[in-house]
Amino acid sequence: MLKIMFNDACGLTNAVLKGNKIRTTRFEKMPDRYRHYLNVKQQGAIPYLINTYDEDTGLFTIKQCHPFKEQMEKFALFSPRYKKGETYAVAQPYKQLPENLKKMLNLKETDAGWNNKMFVKPAYMPWRIRILDVEIFPLYVYAGSEQLCLEEGIIKAPQPFPDNMRYSHISEVENVKYYHSYSNAIAGLFNEVCGRDTWKNHYNQWIVSYKFNVEQNIV
């Protein structure tokens, strides 16, 4: 089993475990041929192009569809990092695991994964996520969908904060950052997690978006 890591400084691991974050976005390397046809598809093409996900192979396929022919010509393939239906261990440093679990697994402060979750064993992790859906779309799609932003972990208050701010996310520098709109909030979150100006510099980039649910693992 493989593991998946979320940003701790911005509270994303905790958001996943609490069920407040049920979607994650990854900037993955796509073949040039695949990205080219994605852009052609976005602009509209006749014969038109279809981008589909095959659950059996775990591959995205772009096919050319001829309006007056039944057959479809396969143009390009892309294999996303995570596959629909599969489970992945949510990485946490050993020191954060429940005391009874640390004792049962005989974990010590000298273990490589005690402070660094990059070195933990997936089988020891008490939580899993199961991938429910895999999608490919440009990053800017988030700017037009409150639902997607909330699934990414953006928090919406029942009532506006002072200055009419209603959306927020945990920040590495500040405890919480507040925003007037969900689009500004998701832009701020991407900049926090992926680096300054990520939203502006990658606004038109195709990304892979994974929707998931969280499950407890019986170690």
What function would you assign to each model-found segment?
Residues 1-219:
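Secondary-structure transition motif
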